[in-house]
Swiss-Prot record:
HAMAP family: MltF
Family: In the N-terminal section; belongs to the bacterial solute-binding protein 3 family.
Cellular-component GO terms for this entry: cell outer membrane
Gene from which this protein is expressed: mltF
GO biological process: cell wall macromolecule catabolic process; cell wall organization; peptidoglycan catabolic process
EC nos: 4.2.2.n1
Protein name: Membrane-bound lytic murein transglycosylase F
Cleavable signal peptide: 1-30
Function: Murein-degrading enzyme that degrades murein glycan strands and insoluble, high-molecular weight murein sacculi, with the concomitant formation of a 1,6-anhydromuramoyl product. Lytic transglycosylases (LTs) play an integral role in the metabolism of the peptidoglycan (PG) sacculus. Their lytic action creates space within the PG sacculus to allow for its expansion as well as for the insertion of various structures such as secretion systems and flagella.
């Protein structure tokens, strides 16, 4: 997966151009016969989406997702409530628009020339490529030339069908596929993993997140180049909704909240390590159950799964782990840190976890209040790894190089510079292994994503097994 970046310049320019073109007809807060006025009169913004880790999901009763958070902010911007409808596949999403059951589709949908003939696109805020996937250990196709409908299944409404048709007409005449009208992309990915299907096609971001939980899913080849992702509304609407969307995206670009959401959901790095992810998930099954009660006990305000991910990064959940520099235990605490926390045995699992949690809380408390709440943890983790003083240097360097010291996206880009003499020689606290702190935080984020997704999958499987047992007729 290529590094994803929101096209801020495009959003800004497009906002100005469309606003100039549309403004005479759309003082949308003043008219009553337009879409925005209708939404505000109704008091509800209706958004249809797909259940996926990136777009929208519910974990322990809390809603997550890049598209969900953006949609919630847009609803707040309009001064209305948000109503989310979850559909199984893309075809059902566009049915909602056609039938007047949705104002917007916010589901990681790709901008496509065929779609824009019938639907109104919004701002394009990140990009993906479409990739053909297979299961590790099975035959990997190197080209679409020999792929046929007995091997490749696509979800209904998937935009890649248009790309496949063009490729069939221009390069691969024997290429064929089938569309399963009853299954969405997530289900098809699961069937590739289970061996029920040979291949399917999904977007690169969805695949990247899926691999954190299912490392046996592998990319065979790119089917398309990078394609922009956007929201869609009805084409026959007036322009008030489009203008409001453009103004909204421009405003969250300017205040930095768009970049923060991008960092939260797309900033976990592109590098997927099959062996490391598989080893981690094995440890989740075999080692974590014994330690889980302790992580839950001492996490307090921190997500216990994040605390567990930190511990795995530190020690691979080995209570006796020792580094060449003398740090020890599950949380790899120094002797001085352990003593300051009142710990007597760093190799005792409970003492180490409780001490590590308290030390992280101390780092969190030191992070300046100007740092947004949902990014404070990343600053704290970098400080946990390399020391708070060096985090101050990283923030100072970010200011000197015209970045935002309260933005984790900006600060993390400067961390590797802390080990380069032209930079650290001019900083208050000198040399630091900033590149290690950068990798440290990125790895923890990946482990947390894997752990959250994997545990959610297990809960789903257990619930389905329980239901099956309850429904099974007694004999």
């Amino acid at each position: 997966m290529k590094k994803l970046k929101i096209n801020y310049l495009f959003i800004g320019i497009l906002t100005l151009l469309l606003a100039a073109a549309l403004w005479p007809s759309i003082p949308w807060f003043g008219k009553t016969e337009n879409h925005i006025a209708a939404i505000q009169a109704r008091g509800v913004l209706r958004v249809s989406t797909i259940d996926s880790p990136l777009t929208y999901s519910v974990i322990n009763g809390k809603k997550y997702g890049l598209d969900y958070e953006l949609a919630q902010q847009f609803a707040n911007y309009l001064g209305v409530k948000l109503k989310v409808t979850v559909r199984q596949n893309i075809s059902q999403l566009f049915d909602d628009l056609d039938n007047g059951n949705a104002d917007l589709l916010a589901a990681g949908l790709v901008y496509d020339s065929a779609r824009v003939k019938n639907y109104q696109p919004g701002p394009m805020y990140y990009s993906v490529s479409q990739q053909l996937v297979y299961r590790v250990g099975q035959y990997r196709p190197r080209s679409l030339a020999t792929v046929n409908e007995n091997q490749l299944t696509i979800a209904p409404g998937h935009v890649v069908v248009n790309d496949l048709q063009r490729l069939k007409e221009t390069k691969f005449p024997d290429l064929s596929w089938k569309v399963d009208d009853k299954k969405g992309s997530t289900t098809l990915l699961e069937e590739v993993i289970s061996g029920k299907l040979d291949y399917t096609i999904a977007d690169s971001v969805a695949i990247s997140l899926f691999q954190r939980v299912h490392p046996e899913l592998a990319v065979a080849l790119d089917v398309t180049d990078e394609q922009p992702v956007t929201w869609f509304s009805r084409l026959d609407d007036d322009n008030t909704l489009s203008a409001a969307l453009l103004d909204f995206f421009n405003s969250i670009n300017e205040d930095g909240s768009l970049a923060r959401i991008e960092e939260k959901y797309l900033g976990h790095g592109d590098d997927f390590d099959y062996v490391d992810t598989r080893s981690f998930l094995r440890a989740v099954d075999n080692v974590l159950p014994e330690l889980e009660p302790l992580f839950k006990k001492y996490a307090k305000e921190i997500d216990w799964r994040l605390l567990a991910a930190i511990s795995y990064q530190e020690s691979h959940w080995d209570p006796l782990a020792t580094s060449p520099t003398g740090v020890r235990g599950l949380m790899m605490l120094t002797k001085n840190t352990a003593q300051s926390l009142g710990l007597t045995d760093r190799t005792d699992a409970e003492q180490s976890i409780s001490g590590g949690a308290r030390y992280l809380e101390d780092m969190m408390a030191k992070v300046p209040e100007t740092v947004p709440e949902d990014e404070r943890i990343w600053f704290a983790l970098a400080a946990y790894n390399m020391g708070y003083a060096h985090m101050l240097d990283a923030r100072s360097l970010t200011v000197k190089t015209k970045g935002n010291p309260d933005s984790w996206t900006d600060v993390k880009q400067r961390l590797p510079l802390l080990s380069q003499k032209p930079y650290y020689s001019k900083l208050t606290y000198g040399y630091a292994r900033g590149h290690e702190a950068y990798a440290y935080v990125e790895n923890i984020r990946k482990y947390q994503i894997s752990l959250v997704g994997y545990l959610q999958e297990k809960e789903k499987q257990e619930a389905e097994a329980m239901k099956l047992a309850q429904d099974y007729p007694a004999v």
